[in-house]
Structures are given as C-alpha cells and as structure tokens.
Amino acid sequence: MEVLRTPDDRFVDLPGYDFAANYVDDLPDYEGLRVHYLDQGAKGANQTFLCLPGEPTWAYLYRRMIPVFSNSGARVVVPDWLGFGRSDKPVDDAVYTFDFHRNMMLAFIEHLDLRNITLVVQDWGGILGLTLPVDQPNRFSRLIVMNTAIPVGVSLGDGFRAWKEYVASRPNMDCGALMKRACPHLSDLEAQAYEAPFPDQRYKAGVRRFPQLVMVEPGMEGIETAKRARKFWQDEWEGESFMAIGAKDPVLGLTVMNQLRKTIRRCPEPIVLEEAGHFLQEWGEPIAQAALKQFGDLY
C-alpha cells in the first residue's frame, strides 16, 4: 500500500491551534499506518470527550471546543481519520471504505482504553461514530451530536446529490476555499488550515472517497451496521444526549436532524444556531458550554 505522510512544516503556526500532536502506528490490522490524535486534559479524568471530525476536515475543527471541555476537568481526545489531517494518507482511493475507517476507530478506542466517553460527532464523524457504541456499549455514556445522519440506503435528497457530484468533479478540491464559503467568519489563515494536510492532489484520496461512501443506495457497505446503530440509539441507549443544529446546512440541516432526534432515545430539544452552517464546530464554544450546562458538568 502506497502511503503519504504530510510534512510537519505544513502545520506550523496555524491560528488558534497550539495543541501537541500524538501518534499511534501499531493498531491491529493497521500496523505501519500512523494515526494522529490530540490528547488534552488529564489522562486520568473521569470523563473523556471523543471528538470525531468529518469530510474534509481534521482535528483543527474542534479547536474552539477543546478548551471548554478540558477546562471542565475532562480528557479530550480528537483523532484524525486516515486520509485526513496529520494521519497517514493511503494513495489509492479504493483503500477507503466504511469498514476501513470504522474498524480503525474501534481499534483506536481499544488501544487508548477510552472509557466513560462523551461521543462528539458531526458529518462523517457521526455517520461512522454513531455506529461505534453498538460494538463497545460499555465505553460510552453521553452524546453530543451535530449535523449528521445515520444513512441506511435511502437518499438524503438533492442537496447531498449535488455535493457528491461537486466533489466527484473536483479531484483536487480546495478544502480551504470550501471552508471559507461554508464559514464566512473564518479568517483566510483559518480557512487555509483545512488545506494544510494536502500538499497536492495525491493526498486527497480520502476527501474524494467519503462522499461516495455515504449509504444512500440499497446494498452499500455499512447499511447493516447503520441499521444496528439505529436500533441501538432508539431502544438500548441509556446515556444522556445533547443535540445542536446549524440551520444553514443545505444537506444535514433541520429536517435531517429532527429525524435523527426521533431515533435517539430521550434526546431533548436541540439547540438551533440560525447563523451556523454544516461545520457547526466553527461556532463551537457556546455549543460546548451549553452541552456542559445540560450535563451538569462544572464550567
């Protein structure tokens, strides 16, 4: 397997981001593939926030939320999916599958022996992340869910179809420009931090593939796992949940999220940010504070 590793100098002096890099390269079945993660706060803390980014982002997306969570006394772990951020990037698009990503994250959680997890998800962080407790139910205790879905082979509508076609027609999509359009309040340097992991098109196999993997047609890999996940959240979930919605998201906005809320047992009324879009973490500080307040954590 041909693998690329983004040079460290691409990540120097990123605005608002001074977190130390951590790596693991010996996950079972992923030996030699280096996975990057942030690990903030006390490792012996009672609560662990596991924050999962999505397409086409990386740990940088959570920079506004990490201090809020860690200041509450919790541990905060933010991994990058393979193909994204500071994690290694297989060159062949075909390497990237639903199970490739999901099994890596299950192994990562086992490797760090994360417990009492507050799962924090958005976009693919949720499409994949919301299936994880099915196989590790005793590790998860709370959920913070933003602009995502649990697709089970049904269309997500014209907005997603347009997004999928958009990415397919741009094999070297400028992730920084995308983020600037989606989050106009970002500075140019902040937006460029999302292009930092990708020196050229060869590094973007994961970016190209994620939209193709969303389970919007019958028979796609991941559908059966997603169906199990829906049943888990609806019938078996015993933990606390917090939902926030960016109302300007044209794909995974209010309609999709209100449907998802019905799937999550005892999920309370969501917080809706009318000014926010798909990448809700870029409005993340007040969201993190509201979640802690709802959970009763000290802040």
Can you say where each PLM-predicted feature lies in the sequence?
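A short loop-to-beta-strand scaffold at the N-terminal edge of the catalytic core in hydrolase folds
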Residues: 30-40
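Conserved HGGG/HGGXW glycine-rich cap/lid loop of the alpha/beta-hydrolase fold
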Residues: 38-88, 280
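Catalytic active-site module of serine/aspartate enzymes centered on a nucleophile-bearing elbow/loop
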Residues: 266-299
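The conserved beta1-alpha1 loop
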Residues: 50-54, 122, 245
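Conserved acidic catalytic loop of the alpha/beta-hydrolase fold
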Residues: 99-117
